[in-house]
Amino acid sequence: TPEGWSVTPWTWDWYRQENWAVKTGKQFNDAVQYRRFGGDLQGVLNKLDYLQNLGVTALFMNPLNDAPSLHKYDARNYHHIDVNFGPDPVGDNKIIASENPADPKTWQWTAADKLFLKLVAEAHKRGMKIIMDYSWNHTGTSFWAFEDLVKYQEKSVYKDWYNVTSFDNPATPENEFAFEGWLGNKFLPEIKKVDLTTERKTGHAYEGNINEGAKQHIFAVTKRWLAPDGDVTNGIDGFRLDVADHIGLGFWRDFRKVVRSVQPEAYLVGEIWWEQWPDQLMNPVPYTSGDVFDAVMFYQAYRPARYFFARTNTEINAQQLKDSLLYQWNRLLPDNRYAMMNTSSTHDSPRLLSDFYNTNKYKYHANPNEDK
């Protein structure tokens, strides 16, 4: 962490840099990655009554899995809640260190895990559902299987979990170890894709699967949270699946079968987004035809709503808004239409109300300094 770093107050002006951030000499977009507001699961528990009074019926939790980053899409352990979200990080790390992460029989419940299950129970008492967010497409470099791979190289039993392009040669002073990271990001090693029978092309559904060992580990984690003590009433209510289009449909069909075998009522929503960034959104139909997801994150509704309500250079009228929404609506099966995750904001997009004041064509130009 930067020198002098501290937790940022909740009401802090978003675009104002903290004193410690200024001292780093980094621009806002770089320094903000170090920002933390200090939230934890107890804080969510404390707000459940407030959320219930607002009429909230489901909580979509961004990744809670143990990970070093602020976003948690760089998993260190899929099967544990991040130790910093619970009451005893030191004790939890000792528990995790005592396990064999490859063997579910050795998995224990940390204090953070137990607090999360308490959150699930309390949410259920209030008629709320809990949806967990996972990225099965990649892990972080501190993920236990990847660390084993780095240490043992071609002798690692996990060498086929990832796309290794070259192993280190111990006879040379250089480190030749190289692997494929998600979208080239070396902090996010990608799980190996197998059994591809159609072209894998960004922004398009394709037929394929993932490495069997990684797949079975993912299934074990899935069952753990759906029925933590063998009783689905004490488990979560569904999953939001990150970068779903980067994984083949074969895996998702198998994943759906596993989920439904444990909890027939579980809700599955996939994140699909760009066919061609930043103008053409993906076709949701391959993912919402009854054998993959119940829904997708429906940015197809967010975009025309913004163009109608905001005063941008891409403004549309009421008829165009209606036509756009009906086009998307009519592409979906009747059972899926009311299940879509229609977003007014996400962790990847500005709040829709805030975005009404963004005069630019694209929502990612949300900084007022970018107004044209």
Language model regions located:
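Short glycine/proline-rich turn/loop motifs
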Residues: W14-G38, I96-D103, W182-N209, T233-I236, ...
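Solvent-exposed loop/turn segments at secondary-structure junctions
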Residues: P2, N65-P68, W136-T141, D245-H246, ...
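Active-site-proximal helices and loops of the catalytic beta/alpha 8
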Residues: V120-M128, N137-H138, F146-Q153, A220-K223, ...
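N-terminal structural segment of carbohydrate-active enzymes
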Residues: T1-K129, N137, W144, K223
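Aromatic/hydrophobic pocket-lining residues that form the small-molecule binding cavity
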Residues: V44, A112, F116, N211-I218, ...
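Aromatic- and acidic-residue-enriched segments that line the glycan-binding/catalytic groove
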Residues: E3-W14, S69-P87, W136-N185, K257, ...
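Polysaccharide-binding and catalytic clefts of secreted carbohydrate-active enzymes
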Residues: L64, D148-V258, V262, W273
